[in-house]
């Protein structure tokens, strides 16, 4: 019973809706030169990268269209994913129009790319979002903070174990989620010539 509670806690802690807010704030504090810049760009990141997708999920929950904020049923995940795709794309174009720092455009482009592929796969198979986003965050931290943050990838097996333990995913689904994010994050940041910021 205690193990199940621990697995559920891990599942909630590493939900993409929460870790994305921490990620945006920490990345902007590190990458930007002034508090003013952080105050300008961070709210836009959080609005389009966290709040809009999460608010739509809450809306579906309040309307009783879904029964769980983690959206366990595969077929129920498609609408939130579509909204997430739109939100990331809007965020990217806003950053492009406002001539935001290149890393922000890269971050939202890569998030959009990852979510599009998650949507396509989810249309026929339940892939893990949790392992996808913790892997995505790990690669993102590596790109922006340096090689030591690759150790964050050690969290992937923990999150994957938790999702399997509470019977939300199979082992194959958690591995697939992580692998997908690893590929899309590596490609996306390479496309913007950011992967060579740090070398192992």
Where are these regions (language model features)?
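Alpha-helical transmembrane segments
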Residues: 38-52, 110
């Amino acid at each position: 019973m205690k193990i199940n509670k621990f697995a559920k806690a891990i599942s909630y802690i590493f939900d993409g809706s929460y870790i994305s807010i921490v990620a945006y704030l920490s990345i902007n504090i590190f990458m930007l030169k002034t508090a003013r810049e952080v105050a300008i760009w961070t709210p836009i990141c959080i609005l389009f990268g966290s709040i809009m997708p999460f608010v739509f999920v809450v809306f579906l929950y309040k309307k009783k269209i879904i029964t769980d904020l983690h959206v366990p049923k595969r077929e129920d995940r498609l609408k939130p994913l579509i909204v997430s795709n739109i939100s990331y794309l809007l965020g990217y174009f806003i950053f492009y129009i406002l001539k935001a720092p290149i890393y922000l455009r890269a971050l939202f482009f890569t998030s959009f790319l990852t979510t599009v592929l998650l949507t396509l796969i989810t249309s026929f198979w339940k892939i893990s979002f949790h392992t996808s986003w913790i892997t995505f965050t790990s690669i993102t931290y590596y790109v922006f903070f340096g090689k030591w943050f690759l150790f964050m990838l050690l969290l992937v097996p923990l999150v994957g174990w938790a999702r399997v333990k509470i019977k939300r995913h199979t082992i194959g689904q958690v591995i697939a989620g992580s692998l997908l994010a690893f590929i899309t994050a590596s490609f996306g940041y390479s496309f913007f010539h950011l992967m060579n910021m740090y070398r192992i």
